[in-house]
Amino acid sequence: MSTEILGDTIDIHGGGADLEFPHHTNEIAQSEAKTGKTFANYWTHNGFVNIDNVKVSKSLGNFITVHDALETIDGQVLRFFFATQHYRKPINFTEKAVRDAETNLKYLKNTYEQPFTGTVDAQELQAFKDKFVAAMDEDFNTANGITVVFEMAKWINSGNYDVAVKEALAAMLEVFGIVFVEEVLDEEIEALIQKRQEARANRDFATADQIRDQLAAQGIKLLDTKDGVRWTRDWCQSH
């Protein structure tokens, strides 16, 4: 099936650490005996997820789905939490670990929202960029990549405010799917909500949906209730 869809050689082949032997060993033997070509260029075997230091197991019923986790955890916080761990190592999912991830992400957002109006040493900035790339080139070492991000954030907060630095910070975080959005004034939000309500009253649902999407892109969640529209502001936006 894989060779039919992806060709004789797959670029990246993933799977759980428990599949490395004998499952993937057999895949290699069978495929390369048939094609005479390398079956996969890179293998990414992920570690297991533990919850409160207990291995996740269907028989124990101690698992949680991503869908359920997102009911109480911001998507970017969850993504950031996983990025702080190397994918090959076991991950211990705990309430404290998630809270720590949220606190650390807020620190990075506060750093990002500083007024970047100064100048910096271009060579110092390039050194951070090179260090980040080197970390990610080391077997997708997101944990080390995040460490570099925090090192640069500390450097920024010591007075190195420049637009180029802000762009570099944003580019690094975007590698992990983390995108911060600019704040929207409450008056602007209320005005757009009123415009959406008028569009709905006129059965102009296309405009109403467009406004909802516009607000969502700015980190504003709308909730239609029998008492009217309620809205909440996400401190970071999930992409």
Located regions from the model:
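Catalytic cores of enzymes that engage adenine nucleotides and/or redox cofactors via long glycine-rich
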Residues: 1-72, 78
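Structural preference for alpha-helix termini/caps and helix-kink/transition segments
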Residues: 55-239
